[in-house]
Amino acid sequence: MGLIAKCLNRMTKSASYIKKQNRFSPLLNYLAALLLSFTPAYCAEVQSSGADSTPRSGAPAQDLTGLSLEELYNLDVIQLNVIGGHTHPAGQIMFGYEFMFMDMGGHLSGTRDVSESEILKSFPSASTGMTVEEHMLEVMYAPTNELTLMAMLPIKHIEMDMVMHGGIHFTEHSEGIGDLQVLALYTLLGSVTKGHRLILNAGMSFPTGSIDEKNTIFGETFKLEYPMQLGSGTYDLRPGLTYLGESKKWAWGAQALTALRFGRNGSGYRLGKEYELTGWLGYAVTDWFAPSLRIKGRIWGNVHGADPNIDPTVDAEGDPHRQGGRRVDLLMGMNFFVPTGILKGTRVMMEAGLPVYENLDGPQLSTRWLFSAGVTYSF
């Protein structure tokens, strides 16, 4: 009970200090207090000088020339789902976990809304909604200041609600690991001490995700459509280029990525190529909190070839020529850092957004909104 009381007292003092120092919402104040309250350095300062004193975690941001190499790398205000969007100093290891969620509903053909009743005039069944959950496990290691190695393995859970003629509803689902990605991030120009870097992303994905997912509905077993499969079934190259910029309080950047697919998988097809461009801006309110704004554009192609076990006449999701599209998302994020104490090196990040433009080779399900949250620990 004594330990619990100490923790609660420490958190209350932290919240009291933070409330006086900024104009954030009460929820954000207490989130920040929770992070600060478990750092021994802050606790010692609170005990010695009271809640009104300024802890190190509230110190104003310094010029780049006054920061250590490790602190400079920590200025990268980048969401976890910007793949390969940050690097590490030599010898540092990072473990990360990220949760991603996408909710889909309504249909588009091009930019035109299409109703389910209109789809059912051409197909015996139509999708009514879809959710994609992804749990991403990440590890990064930097053998040198210029080179960072990265590996990512997703675990997916996908559900798609369907309706048939006569108003009969059913749900398809698939779950399991997706394709493993391995990347090398190499600094081509600049350095973290200068505040500008150009980084080469050299990546490859391996077909560890299943392309043979099946469901049994109303006593009949059938192979699930292309969006319900967990992997690509092919070895894909994932090259890219990332620019990172940092100043006293600001961080910004841009990234271009591609997924280049070759050959065909064991089911006789390959997914379309993907092209992605994203840019972001972050502001360090303190050295433990930084909001961010990001815009992301993505183009993906239709399926080449076809799986003979997926009937393209049953629903639009099974048609290889109705898989491509273009979308622009606007996303806002929050980034929390632990600068001192036993949890030093920990980051907690959240980001949410929605499409501002969508053009689909449909009819296809439209994206309603996206959310991601994650935590990383570097040492």
What do the predicted segments below correspond to?
Residues L108-I119, N265-F379:
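Outer membrane beta-barrel transmembrane domains
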Residues Q79-G84, P143-N145, L185-T193, L198, ...:
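Outer-membrane beta-barrel proteins
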Residues G85, Y97, L137-Y141, A151, ...:
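Residues on the lipid-exposed face of transmembrane beta-strands in outer-membrane beta-barrel proteins
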Residues C43-L120, T193-I199, T208-E213, Y226:
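Outer-membrane beta-barrel biogenesis signature
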Residues I83-Q92, M104-L108, G129, E146, ...:
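Short loop/turn motifs that connect adjacent beta-strands in outer-membrane beta-barrel proteins
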Residues I93-Y97, L149-A151, V182, H196-A202, ...:
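Transmembrane beta-strands of outer-membrane beta-barrel proteins
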Residues G91, T131-H135, S174-L180, H196, ...:
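Residues that define the transmembrane beta-barrel architecture of outer-membrane proteins
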Residues P154-G266, E317-G325, Y357:
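Outer-membrane pore/translocation modules
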